[in-house]
A protein has these predicted regions:
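Conserved acidic donor-binding segment of nucleotide-sugar-dependent glycosyltransferases
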Residues: 327-328, 332-339, 348-353
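Aromatic "clamp/platform" in nucleotide-sugar-dependent glycosyltransferases that forms part
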Residues: 295
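Nucleotide-activated donor-binding/catalytic signature segment of Leloir-type glycosyltransferases, i.e.
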Residues: 257-275
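A short, well-ordered alpha-helix in the C-terminal region of glycosyltransferases
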Residues: 265, 341, 348, 355-369, ...
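Short alpha-helical donor nucleotide-sugar binding micro-motif in glycosyltransferases
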Residues: 100-101, 274-275, 282-287
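Short glycine/serine-rich donor-binding loops of glycosyltransferases
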Residues: 300-303, 321
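Short hydrophobic beta-strand element within catalytic cores of glycosyltransferases
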Residues: 312-315
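Conserved donor-binding/catalytic core segment of Leloir-type glycosyltransferases
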Residues: 199-223, 229-232
């Protein structure tokens, strides 16, 4: 545990706003939960982040803890004009950095975040306690933005504090430590025990219910929901009954809606839009299988959420898939190359009731170590040990 007097400042690009209730809020409820549980280890916490105007279409969560906020400009994008805008806002960020430097003695820099590049140089040469995280794919990949690679290079070779990243194992030589991205508390795990037991009993009894699939993520090419739609179309053409919930929103929503309508799938595949955390939990409870076909992924939080609810994941093979599946104990990996092959694999696998029950039990046991409490405790313990050595 960090000493009680430690005051934490978090620098992030997570967009916030003030809700109609006059309370700081964000659409990224996972970020909110993680920062609130981390803040419990400190006497006071500041979050330095962009603020925008509130709009009625936002699906948001309000903060409940006593966290102080410093607003910064909301900028970003990949166009040259976007980069120039970012450069123009650096003085405003530096002004905020100067303020929080006087108020906190421990600083948490979250990457990837272009505006944390000046944050890196500003704080890395102070005598303050520092730690950072990189919430993206750590290994380089084709098409990766050059600024992402630059940030990883800085963190690995020059950052003076511990860095938490999605790794298969710790790399103390480079002060890199593996982490994960939790959504739920231990209490949530306990709450789902009865519902999960019913799922397992149903498998043991050989019940032939309609399989229910779920996939969660932004509707874009990287998340690759089109591959899932193609595979489910094949199941439909083979007269296999099922339901599938696609949760999210994004630029490909209309394309997906047209595909569903054009292939007579409107009674089987449902576009759910963005959901509040509790509404998503209700869908997980109804679901049997999770399909994530993301082409690039860090430590996907969605499969872990599935484990809590007894949902068995099918994950496209990416850098961390083997770790997330606990070496295949908790789910199944596939190559998102040919929807015909995947559809056949899916049809064969979901019939193996005993195997599926084993996967649910393994996922539940695995997820016990992936709670918000475990995540925050590991960070605090690692930071303390790092600076006391």
């Amino acid at each position: 545990m960090m000493k009680a007097f430690k005051k934490l400042a978090i620098i992030s690009d997570c967009v916030h706003f003030i809700s109609p209730n006059g309370i700081a809020a964000t659409e990224n409820h996972i970020f909110l939960r993680q920062m609130e549980v981390l803040a419990k280890h400190f006497s006071h916490t500041i979050i330095c982040c962009p603020f925008v105007e509130f709009s009625d279409n936002k699906i948001y969560t309000e903060y409940t803890g006593a966290i102080e906020f410093y607003a910064t400009p909301n900028v970003g994008g990949n166009k040259v004009s976007d980069k120039l805008t970012i450069l123009k806002t650096i003085p405003a960020w530096l002004k905020v950095f100067k303020k929080i430097k006087r108020q906190a003695d421990c600083f948490y820099l979250r990457f990837p975040d272009n505006l944390n590049i000046p944050g890196f140089f500003y704080f890395n040469f102070t005598k303050k306690i520092l730690f950072a995280s990189y919430a993206g794919t750590w290994k380089n990949y084709p098409g990766e933005p050059s600024t992402y690679r630059f940030q990883k290079y800085l963190l690995k070779h020059f950052f003076k504090g511990p860095v938490f990243a999605y790794l298969e194992k710790d790399e103390p030589k480079y002060h890199l430590y593996k982490t994960f991205s939790p959504s739920y508390f231990q209490e949530t795990w306990e709450e789902e025990s009865e519902n999960v037991a019913l799922k397992i009993n149903g498998l043991h009894e050989g019940k032939k219910d309609i399989p229910v699939f779920i996939s969660v993520g932004a509707f874009n090419a990287q998340k690759n929901q089109q591959f899932i739609l193609e595979a489910l179309k094949i199941l439909h053409e083979k007269d296999i009954d099922f339901k599938c919930y696609l949760v999210g929103d994004g630029p490909l929503k209309q394309q997906y809606a047209a595909f569903i309508a054009g292939n007579s799938l409107t009674g089987k595949i449902f576009l759910m839009g963005k959901l509040k955390a509790n509404d998503l939990r209700m869908l997980y409870r109804k679901s049997d299988f999770l399909i994530q076909a993301s082409l690039i992924e860090g430590y996907g939080k969605v499969p872990v959420e599935g484990y809590f609810h007894g949902v068995i994941p099918f994950l496209h093979k990416t850098q961390m898939t083997n770790v997330i599946l606990d070496n295949g104990k908790c789910g199944f990996a596939f190559e998102a190359n040919d929807p015909v092959i995947f559809a056949q694999f899916l049809m064969e696998t979901i019939q193996q009731k005993s195997l599926l029950a084993e996967k649910i039990i393994a996922g539940r046991n695995f997820s016990k170590g992936l709670t918000l409490e475990k995540w925050s405790a590991r960070i605090v313990e690692t930071v303390q040990n790092f600076y006391e050595r």
